[in-house]
């Protein structure tokens, strides 16, 4: 399969929006196709949810925030689904505890699939009744938000089922090994792209010609920040490089760790990234569990390391600074600025980060225009950087931890009503990640996109790219 290009979808008609709606909904069903009914019920850690619940909740979102508000006389599919499949919207009423989701053997899967069909038909009727696009701009905006929300849950389905299958003592594969990335070659040496100090704009603001482009409220408002001079690595840290940190006693040296991170190491016995195991059967070193089953370290050593917590990423950066002065994690604004400069480096002209199409085919200047490794590639795991020079893998492969705490931008205002709970109430004790991963849909990511997780989170495809101070 040809690798996808990261791009935003600029929807300009009701029919185009309906086509996009159907495509996104179909992709969700394709993700659960390899799973048995029993697989769909598993919830193996506190962060995860059963795939069956994801199927229902994504339909609940459209029913709750679109159909109930914009379809006169709309009848809910089931009177109990409104509270049963609510996730965390407290202003809409009570909901079951997240830890109980795996106990929902009823409603059965057939009812959940009928629920999806019911909601899909209602959305289609709504859009087909509005040939003059957009007849209701707020309804369109909420449908687009629902699609972005569903794409987030597509990634969660992949990460949740990976954890569930790994927890199973049989360690079954989600899909067969035909989609495994090639083990040939080595990652290119790290180079450093250097940027001068100055003021820059960050955040998302569409222009008049692209008013239909979507962003979450936490990407706004666009505002000015000052960046000190910095350099950023041309690729993420690889498994081999992280293994060197481990071999140097990285998990046994408290001087490398933040206090809370060291507590996690001691209390939870961290000694490697999640899904790494020493291969005792063959005594050949490490092996790594992937969605296509176990793979030897030799096959993945040159791919970006993933399933790291922020604490592990930060400890690695501190260790690396002993060898290269000034090395650290980038701030989220340094990352966004570097990502936004792809257009400048390729074409020699400024380009807005949030409207960036990456890669830009046909260009061959400073940045390697290799396609992004995202959900559509089917690799389901980070792949090796190409041998070409320049900034690589800025989108896809692994979410990249930054040193920035997740908080609101100056002038931030959450959305009105229950949708205001989507992002704003989580702006505490979380860190920002950027760039998307190998299971992020290509039409979902953009340079201004802010993901966020607590610093101990490991079950996501999270890795790191280094930055460093420059004089």
Spans of model-derived segments:
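Disulfide-stabilized, aromatic/cysteine-rich ligand-recognition loop
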Residues: 1-49, 53-122, 126-132, 136-165, ...
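Functional-site microenvironments in short loops/helix caps that host divalent-cation chemistry
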Residues: 146, 150-152, 156, 160, ...
């Amino acid at each position: 399969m040809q690798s996808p290009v990261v791009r935003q979808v600029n929807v300009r008609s009701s029919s185009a929006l309906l086509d996009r709606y159907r495509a996104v909904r179909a992709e969700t069903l394709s993700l659960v196709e390899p799973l048995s009914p029993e697989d769909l019920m598993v919830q193996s850690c506190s962060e995860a949810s059963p795939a069956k619940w994801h199927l229902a909740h994504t339909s609940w979102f459209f029913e709750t925030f679109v159909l109930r508000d914009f379809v006169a006389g709309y009848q809910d599919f089931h009177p109990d689904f409104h509270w049963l499949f609510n996730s965390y919207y407290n202003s809409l009423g009570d909901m079951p505890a997240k830890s109980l989701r795996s106990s929902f053997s009823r409603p059965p899967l057939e009812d959940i699939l009928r629920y999806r069909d019911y909601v899909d038909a209602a959305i289609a009727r709504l859009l087909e009744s509005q040939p003059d696009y957009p007849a209701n701009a707020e309804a369109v905006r909420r449908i687009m938000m629902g699609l972005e929300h569903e794409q987030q849950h597509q990634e969660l389905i992949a990460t949740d089922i990976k954890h569930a299958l790994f927890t199973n003592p049989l360690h079954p594969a989600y899909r067969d090994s035909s989609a495994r990335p090639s083990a040939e070659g080595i990652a290119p040496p790290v180079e450093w792209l250097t940027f001068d100090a100055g003021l820059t704009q960050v955040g998302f603001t569409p222009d008049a010609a692209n008013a239909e482009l979507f962003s979450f409220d936490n990407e706004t408002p666009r505002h000015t920040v000052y960046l000190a001079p910095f350099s950023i690595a041309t690729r993420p840290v690889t498994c081999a490089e992280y293994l060197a940190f481990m071999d140097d006693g990285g998990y046994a040296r408290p001087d490398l760790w933040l206090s809370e991170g060291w507590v996690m190491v001691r209390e939870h016995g961290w000694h490697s990234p999640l899904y790494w195991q020493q291969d005792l059967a063959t005594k050949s070193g490490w092996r790594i569990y992937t969605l296509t089953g176990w793979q030897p370290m030799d096959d993945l050593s040159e791919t970006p390391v993933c399933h790291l917590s922020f604490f592990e990423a930060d400890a690695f950066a501190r260790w690396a600074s002993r060898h290269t002065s000034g090395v650290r994690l980038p701030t989220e604004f340094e990352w966004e600025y570097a990502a936004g400069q792809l257009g400048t480096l390729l074409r020699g002209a400024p380009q807005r980060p949030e409207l960036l199409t990456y890669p830009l085919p046909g260009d061959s200047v400073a940045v390697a225009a290799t396609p992004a490794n995202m959900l559509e590639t089917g690799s389901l795991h980070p792949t090796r950087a190409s041998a070409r020079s320049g900034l690589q893998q800025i989108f896809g492969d692994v979410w990249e931890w930054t040193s920035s705490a997740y908080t609101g931008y100056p002038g931030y205002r959450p959305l009105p009503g229950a949708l205001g709970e989507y992002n704003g109430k989580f702006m505490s004790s979380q860190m920002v990640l950027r760039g998307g991963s190998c299971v992020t849909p290509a039409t979902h990511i953009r340079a201004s996109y802010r993901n966020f997780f607590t610093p101990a989170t490991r079950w996501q495809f999270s890795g790191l790219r280094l930055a460093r101070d420059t004089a």
